[in-house]
Amino acid sequence: PHRYLATNSPQGPWWLLGWCERVPEADEVLPAPLPPYRVLTGLVDRFGRTQTFHREAAGEFSGEITGVTDGAGRHFRLVLTTQAQRAEEARQQAISGGTEPSAFPDTLPGYTEYGRDNGIRLSAVWLTHDPEYPENLPAAPLVRYGWTPRGELAAVYDRSNTQVRSFTYDDKYRGRMVAHRHTGRPEIRYRYDSDGRVTEQLNPAGLSYTYQYEKDRITITDSLNRREVLHTQGEAGLKRVVKKEHADGSVTQSQFDAVGRLKAQTDAAGRTTEYSPDVVTGLITRITTPDGRASAFYYNHHSQLTSATGPDGLEMRRKYDEYGRLIQETAPDGDITRYRYDNPHSDLPCATDDATGSRKTMTWSRYGQLLTFTDCSGYVTRYDHDRFGQVTAVHREEGLSQYHAYDSRGQLTAVKDTQGHETRYEYNAAGDLTTVIAPDGSRNGTQYDAWGKAICTTQGGLTRSMEYDAAGRVIRLTSENGSHTTFRYDVLDRLIQETG
């Protein structure tokens, strides 16, 4: 009687609101009254799959979410830490490393400009139960987070314990990010004005930008001295860019309705495309191109597209079942494709029938992974997956199979066929594919610049190289025979000349 459902559509999702169980204090008068508010305890989709949130009943994390069970039955443990725990951990690490402990306060200010702060942070997420792999759970967290002494997110580590993101913050303004980095990539830095607005974005291996703010106007200048001006209208969440002055002096414009939905766009040549959003849903019901030709779109009461008519008058139609699943699609040429389902709790089809009467069938795992595919000739392909959902084997007819291996970061490292022929793959720290080793031992490689753009590729002993400008555009290509091709661009990055 004290649990509630909330939804904005009969098809869901439904929000389950209730209260979390807690252990009463020793001197508390029982029965304790119910709290005056409800908290989110679960989320149910239209197929009955429930994501359940488990909250701590007692202790320093009482009322906090410390576990999640997804709709497939997997359980995840959310490891929370307090500021005091993180401070103690930092001190212990300093002692074990023989270094001087850094300043790490045991408490944080209770309130910030963003609201109340209890100092609790998410430090790791573990998979603790998997119905498909109950005896093969990961021995490490799926993701781990590091925090600064001021409670700011400092680093993100993936399941291999590799740091994949890092963040740096302003010494004076808590929570103001001044730099961030992806693993293997240069650090991008930011500068701010007194109002907390970004005035500079500094990219050491690419374009940098400056931002100048005026009333209803923002000027953006890159390190090639190209300038764009954004003209805005509206306030807060309804502020929109209504005019854009491009680096070549051309102007494009946009119009919006009273609630901020796009109504029209005018290109640099003065040609206007009009959009007609539905008053209630905001879905586009009509698009009229500059030449006056129109496309129309129609939806059901669940906001699903039921038909679309193009400027040529041809119509595409769709039908759905009571669960909102697509069951039939009629192409503009009249061809009909039907979709069939054998499980009321799944949105994945078990079969498709095309206009020729040919049928393809599929089976799926509880996690939505394709297990088998049978084509219209009756040939069956089977797929094996690991606990992370990656394909580990593909089995085709006549005993032909292909096996995939991955490293701890989830990167494909090897592909082997039934005869034992193996192709191996190597990567750099950023995750770029650097080497492909064929079954005969031959190697093909690629070298990259700081931003991950290929600067040199070698295949069969032949090398091709590329040079880029600060904007990341190819300006010189040297082919395998040593010939050169150069490229020039205009201020809008359009190719205007190719020589070679």
Residue ranges, per PLM feature:
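Extended charged/polar low-complexity repeat regions
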Residues: 1-500
